[in-house]
Design a protein with these regions (language model features):
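Extracellular/luminal domains of secretory-pathway glycoproteins
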Residues: 2-560
Length: 560
């Protein structure tokens, strides 16, 4: 038995002294994890976060220019010309409009704006405005300087309040033709006094009629006289109206009372981001590609979770916390006490922490020592595929869907609820599609890396042929001596198998001879052991029979 053990040790020593080359992959101390279709929190050497999560908390310029910040005014205050908004009346240009939640200068005379939400949307979608006079004061033969204490003792800068003059209010008939070549936004109002006395004092009669007509509209208005709850100390109201006069169209107004007449209109030009932000954020000295009500952001990532109301050149919004794409290998820690190379045990056992110049590579052992080198070709191909994957995800998700914070009046609450629900569901679909796409790509990436290692292994296996033997752990034990230059030819694909065939053949025969000798010795020892054991058993049985017959315990009768 000692002879068998000795031969086994010699055989193992003969094999382990062979020059050796292993194929493996990179392992790092990374803590990155990704999810795949079948696994969660899979450790990887490298991962790319696809979701942008930060903003600067400021109002910034965008590619379309600076925002228009209304400060104490509302949009309707600007449009109708609240005297407190005079600084805003000069020609302006903007990329988006900012309305402060605390703004108090809206409609100074109480009343309602017809289709206010549509008006705000129309005005904010333009990029600039220019005020233009529609009706000069001289066109009216009544008083046109009606004022109100609620409007700072004055009145709207874009409308004239027409009242009786010298106790009379003749029919007013005015026309204006748009020769500007652009659309003109014009505004007017109808006054509804609280009492008949107030009505007569202002317009001499109670049964007045006002008509406003263009090629597209024909509106008739009559006053609704009666007291209403006090607002700003007033029981009267003004109903505010607006329309758009297209190039070449004519506006005609006829009235015998209660008319708040157009004075100035707006030529709206260009196109902005069509957004109104209601926020207290401060203006910053910054330019961003994407703006939200929370702040600006610049990113090249395909997704963001800052705000679903982002506008500009923005990544698609998905409401999750993280979305990571695997851009490296499955991170399998190396075994620290296994194999000839210590921590390096082949791709079956784990990754190589010392492989830093590539994702896949080789380690060898020969008379010159131990060496490691990356396989740049397979690594570059894998990196190119990863880059293509990232671009592919961006391309697949680049269909823009902007959610606008729609404004609906109180009577349209159900519309608002339906709109928000639809927006939320669309966002859920985008998020699901994005997550599913990344999970699929992660699964494919990790599977491809496994295939890349196997491909590299099989490439070396084909090159070595019968000049080496596999050890089952991702390594090849060579039948011939292979110095560093020889190892390099294996790595770069120029290995000359014929050059080493004769040496390999002799070494293989030598190893096989040791195996045959050990097998013959094992057979001899087995036969010897079997015969010896049989003799011992036979002698023991004979001694037992002799003892039994001598004391009479056993008797043998022979019958003839």
């Amino acid at each position: 038995m000692e002879t068998v053990s000795l031969i086994t040790i010699l055989l193992a020593a003969t094999v382990s002294n062979a020059d050796k080359i292993c194929i493996g992959y990179q392992s790092t101390n990374s803590t990155e994890t990704v999810d795949t279709l079948t696994e969660n929190n899979v450790p990887v050497t490298h991962a790319k976060e696809l979701l942008h999560t930060e903003h600067n908390g400021m109002l910034c310029a965008t590619s379309l220019g600076q925002p228009l910040i209304l400060d104490t005014c509302t949009i309707e205050g600007l449009i109708y010309g609240n005297p407190s908004c005079d600084p805003l009346l000069e020609e302006r240009e903007w990329s988006y409009i900012v309305e402060r939640p605390s703004a108090v200068n809206g409609l100074c005379y109480p009343g309602n704006v017809e289709n206010l939400e549509e008006l705000r949307s129309l005005f904010s979608s333009a990029r600039s405005y220019q005020r233009i006079q529609i009706f000069p004061d001289t066109i009216w033969n009544v008083s046109y300087d009606g004022t109100s204490n609620t409007c700072s003792g004055s009145f709207y800068r874009n409308m004239r309040w027409l009242t009786r003059k010298n106790g009379n209010y003749p029919i007013q008939d005015a026309q204006y033709t748009n020769n500007q070549g652009k659309n003109i936004l014009f505004m007017w109002g109808i006054n509804h006094p609280p009492t008949n006395d107030t009505q007569r004092n202002l317009y001499t009669r109670t049964d007045t009629t006002t008509s406003v007509a263009t090629e597209e509209i024909n509106r008739i208005f009559k006053p609704l006289i009666g007291p209403r709850p006090l607002v700003n100390g007033l029981m009267g109201r003004i109903n505010y109206h607006w329309s758009v006069l297209k190039p070449g169209q004519t506006l005609r107004i006829k009235s015998d009372g209660n008319l708040i007449a157009p004075w100035y209109g707006y030529i709206l030009s260009g196109e902005s981001h069509r957004r109104i932000l209601r926020t207290d954020l401060k203006r910053g000295s910054c330019t961003v590609q994407c703006q939200t009500e929370k702040g600006g952001l610049n990113t090249t990532l395909p997704f963001q979770n800052v705000s679903k109301y982002a506008f500009g050149n923005c990544s698609k919004y998905i409401g999750i916390k993280s979305l990571k794409l695997a851009v490296g290998l499955r991170n399998v820690p190396s075994r620290s006490s296994r194999g000839l190379f210590g921590a390096i045990a082949g791709f079956i056992e784990g990754g190589w922490s010392g492989l830093v110049a590539g994702w896949y590579g080789f380690q060898h052992s020969n008379d010159q020592g131990v060496g490691m080198a990356a396989d740049r070709e397979s690594t570059q191909k894998a990196i190119d595929k990863i880059t293509s994957k990232v671009n592919n995800i961006v391309d697949k998700m680049n269909k823009q869907y902007e959610i606008i914070d729609h404004e609906f009046s109180e009577v349209e609450t159900r519309l608002n609820m339906i709109n928000n629900k639809i927006d939320d569901q669309i966002q859920d679909i985008w998020a699901y599609n994005a997550e599913l796409l990344v999970l699929l790509e992660n699964q494919k990436t990790l599977d491809e890396h496994d295939a890349n290692v196997n491909n590299l292994y099989n490439k070396v296996k084909r090159a070595l042929g019968s000049n080496a033997v596999e050890d089952g752990k991702g390594c090849f034990e060579l039948y011939h001596k292979c110095d560093d230059q020889c190892m390099e030819t294996i790595r770069n694909g120029t290995y000359n198998r014929r050059k080493y065939q004769e040496e390999s053949k002799l070494e293989r025969q030598k190893i096989e001879g040791v195996k045959l000798e050990s097998e013959g010795t094992y057979r001899i020892l087995t036969i010897y052991s079997t015969v010896a054991s049989s003799l011992v058993i036979a002698m023991g049985f004979a001694a037992f029979l002799f003892w039994a017959m001598s004391n009479g315990s056993c008797r043998c009768n022979i019958c003839i």
